[in-house]
From Swiss-Prot:
Family stated for the protein in its record: Belongs to the betacoronavirus nucleocapsid protein family.
Positions where Phosphothreonine occurs in the chain: T451
Modification after translation (UniProt): ADP-ribosylated. The ADP-ribosylation is retained in the virion during infection.
Pfam family, one: CoV_nucleocap
Basic and acidic residues: compositionally biased ranges: 18-33, 379-390
Superkingdom in the source lineage: Viruses
Region (Disordered): 1-64, 181-228, 373-399, 419-468
Gene Ontology annotations for the cellular component aspect, listed alphabetically: host cell endoplasmic reticulum-Golgi intermediate compartment; host cell Golgi apparatus; ribonucleoprotein complex; viral nucleocapsid
Known role: Packages the positive strand viral genome RNA into a helical ribonucleocapsid (RNP) and plays a fundamental role during virion assembly through its interactions with the viral genome and membrane protein M. Plays an important role in enhancing the efficiency of subgenomic viral RNA transcription as well as viral replication.
PROSITE patterns hit by this protein: COV_N_CTD, COV_N_NTD
Residue ranges constituting the CoV N NTD domain according to the UniProt record: 62-186
Record keywords: ADP-ribosylation, Host Golgi apparatus, Phosphoprotein, Ribonucleoprotein, RNA-binding, Transcription, Transcription regulation, Viral nucleoprotein, Virion
Name of the protein in its database record: Nucleoprotein
This protein's encoding gene: N
Species whose genome carries this gene: Bat coronavirus HKU9
Amino acid sequence: MSGRNRSRSGTPSPKVTFKQESDGSDSESERRNGNRNGARPKNNNSRGSAPKPEKPKAAPPQNVSWFAPLVQTGKAELRFPRGEGVPVSQGVDSTYEHGYWLRTQRSFQKGGKQVLANPRWYFYYTGTGRFGDLRFGTKNPDIVWVGQEGANINRLGDMGTRNPSNDGAIPVQLAGGIPKGFYAEGRGSRGNSRSSSRNSSRASSRGNSRASSRGASPGRPAANPSTEPWMAYLVQKLERLESQVSGTKPATKNPVQVTKNEAAANAKKLRHKRTAHKGSGVTVNYGRRGPGDLEGNFGDREMIKLGTDDPRFAAAAQMAPNVSSFLFMSHLSTRDEDDALWLHYKGAIKLPKDDPNYEQWTKILAENLNAYKDFPPTEPKKDKKKKEETAQDTVIFEDASTGTDQTVVKVWVKDQDAQTDDEWLGGDETVYEDEDDRPKTQRRHKKRGSTASRVTIADPTNAGAERS
């Protein structure tokens, strides 16, 4: 028995089995020296030894977001209503749910030309990321500041940033849904496939290192992968490819169509319970714009026509109070009439100038507030054009010179004082050297009248006397 199987003093001998016994050259000293010099041991069987846990790698020098990006596919920039825009996360207190979306764009070579890829937007909590030193609301063309209701922008959390060597990106989920013209990268990405291929010992080691290194992190939301926006985007792409192969057009969402019954039902609602949209505009539901106490003074011509379907409405709605604020912030008074009780309200809304949407609000107010004063005056409906006071009558008489019947077209002509400018100019008496120089309208008129004699009768009632 070789000496390597003897137990050392105070140390129990490990039970190790080998498929093949090494030859005489494979001595303990050579194996020890070879391992010290970094050489690979000759015995390749390592099943008996426990694998060493992998040490977590240090964070990279750049700042990496906890969340996967939103990819912009449309022309509209990223915008969120007030109180929305922070990704849904676990382990983050609502006080710290505020941050910014950073716009990035890469380029690549295609056909010898530089092509820009779709812009990508990454979310960072306030105080983290590339612009971690900026105060909330600081203006930057590549940044959109967002914050949830109840968040305190003056308090910063300890979420930090992500180490991509230890953690995969979290797919973005928004309470209000992904904005139109964007899709969220997420499930089925490199991070998940990599983590599923790791063995249990490495996963447990990495999990322990996460808990000790990152502290309070957003965590992974427990959601069904089939409900992710990324899967919905893939389904949409597959449907589009299928339609291209079959030659059929993909089914598109029909615009909202309001039937007469729906419009009538909307009209039966109380005015403050109606909703104006493209099929039922502002004027139909709330009346004309004007200076009266019961007349609205907000909305330009486009906003009045489209109502809530106007692309600016979402930003304008951020200025409007919710139900609770309306009831408890307004100064209310009543006025009793025979058929109804009128509830009057008066109040004010504060729009902070340091809000990132302040400039957009002021622009919307400038375009829509009292815009009715610049509306063109309404033109009265025009009556149908009166028929021209001309009449034609065709008679047959015998031409004395030829002895044959000749068609005569009698044209009743207006008096010169009653003729319009166009009618007066139409009677051009200019003598042209060449007939082709005459205007085409007159040449066509002459051609039509070439088969009949033209007789002008001043008094239609005395046609017989004038012809004789």
